[in-house]
Curated annotation (Swiss-Prot):
One of its GO terms (biological process) is translation. It comes from Clostridium botulinum (strain Eklund 17B / Type B). It comes from the Bacteria. This is Small ribosomal subunit protein uS15. InterPro entries: Ribosomal_uS15, Ribosomal_uS15_bac-type, uS15_NS1_RNA-bd_sf. The keyword Nucleus does not apply.
């Protein structure tokens, strides 16, 4: 993910200009990295080091989603729908 794509995601999901800490932005950035790494692992099936990193990112995203669901269920439902995550 290049810098321009990262700024685009922050602008799209951020609550204000330059908002990088909100759960929505963190979840969206993690989702982008997860999708990228998933494509990498389809080509490089034996890359177990990257697979472990992928599983850690998925776990981190799950924790952020759980936090958001506890804090504000509407924001949670919105981000799930926007990113196309199933739950």
């Amino acid at each position: 993910m290049d810098k321009a794509r990262k700024l685009e995601i922050i602008k799209q999901y951020g609550r204000s200009e330059g908002d990088t800490g909100s759960p929505e932005v963190q979840i969206a950035l993690l989702t982008e990295r997860i999708n990228s790494l998933t494509g990498h692992l389809k080509v490089h099936k034996k890359d177990h080091h990257s697979r472990r990193g992928l599983l850690m990112m998925v776990g981190h995203r799950r924790g952020l989603l759980n936090y958001l669901a506890d804090q504000d269920i509407e924001r949670y439902r919105t981000i799930i729908k926007q990113l196309g995550l199933r739950r």
